[in-house]
Amino acid sequence: MSLQSIKYSRGSLEILDQLLLPGQSKYLVVRGVEDGWKVINKMQVRGAPAIAIVGCLSLAVEINPEDFETKKSLRQEIEGKLNYLVSARPTAVNMKIAADELITLANDLYKDEAINVTEMKQRFLDATEAMLKKDIADNRAIGANGAKAILQRVAETGAAPAGSTGSVRVLTHCNTGSLATAGYGTALGVVRQLAELGKLEHVYCTETRPYNQGARLTAYELVHEKFPATLVLDSMVAALLRAKNVAAVVVGADRVASNGDTANKIGTYQIAVVAKHHDVPFYVAAPLTSIDLAIPGGDHIIIEERPDREMTHVGEHRIAAPGINCWNPAFDVTPASLITGIITERGVFKPAELKEAITKLLES
């Protein structure tokens, strides 16, 4: 059974505090938007899909018990609070897209004279809650599409380890599983699907400094699922790809530009460079909500910078020399030229065909 990072029923929201994993499993009650903003900003919940879901559900929890006198006051509350939630972690586009969609819904309901304020609130809550089910369904589709693409490439190139009967070894970075989504996962969903098909020989996960999402969270999920897995240091990737016959690298995304440039957890770019050198396919697994067609390339993506302490300390213990300066971007941008394919719930696309393909899908 997959881990559950988000527990929700109407009027109640709890999130698994990921800062305490793997040592302690503790759920935090999110009572409203301010709590939602804080748990996102402090990275007690993280992963672009999970950020969007928790942000929007925190608003649902807040407005559920409230009685609004007018549709205008409800619309203003929705718009103001959603825009505030976007500011918690600006690089991840999913929260912005979800906010824009829900604000558009609120405006449409506001303009519909046949709908009263009570029904307007009900429909808004229904739409927000539907995000949970949709995310899990999308993740399963991403997993299926990604596993198919990897296995097809292995069959064409003969890249599977000798004697493996078609099973593959894959590398992943950061955390993209049940803890980063409503469930199942994006890049880790691809790994999960390979395992369900009996085609996963081994998965390697990076520690993912400085926040150690790989060592703390992905390793935690892999052990929980009893997948054959090995943790490696970030600095070991080149040696790993040279020595272990890895069939593919699959990572998640916080924002994908229309040309395929991809912002993901810091360290992704260098893994892509190494994968290119070793002729290992490099895949990005992300829902359509992570693709931002409004920006032409990675240079337009805002990169969040985190506090020095995340680099200089592990818990309360300082590991860096006092007085040293730090540069701590949370993400880097992998150029589209290094990406083999972008795995979505609607198919796998080469970066060069992404904009046209997604535009057609959204119009259909």
From Swiss-Prot:
Disulfide bonds: none
Record localization: Cytoplasm; Nucleus
Entry's Gene Ontology BP terms: L-methionine salvage from methylthioadenosine
Keyword Methyltransferase: no
Family, as annotated: Belongs to the eIF-2B alpha/beta/delta subunits family. MtnA subfamily.
GO-annotated molecular function: S-methyl-5-thioribose-1-phosphate isomerase activity
Active site (record annotation): 254 (proton donor)
Keyword tags: Amino-acid biosynthesis, Cytoplasm, Isomerase, Methionine biosynthesis, Nucleus
The protein's name in its UniProt record: Methylthioribose-1-phosphate isomerase
Role according to the record: Catalyzes the interconversion of methylthioribose-1-phosphate (MTR-1-P) into methylthioribulose-1-phosphate (MTRu-1-P).
Organism for this UniProt entry: Drosophila yakuba (Fruit fly)
Coiled-coil regions listed in the entry: none
Domain of life: Eukaryota
A cellular component annotation (GO) from this entry: cytoplasm
Biochemical pathway: Amino-acid biosynthesis; L-methionine biosynthesis via salvage pathway; L-methionine from S-methyl-5-thio-alpha-D-ribose 1-phosphate: step 1/6
UniProt keyword Cytoplasm, yes or no: yes
Catalytic activity entry: 5-(methylsulfanyl)-alpha-D-ribose 1-phosphate = 5-(methylsulfanyl)-D-ribulose 1-phosphate
Enzyme Commission no: 5.3.1.23
Pfam family, one: IF-2B
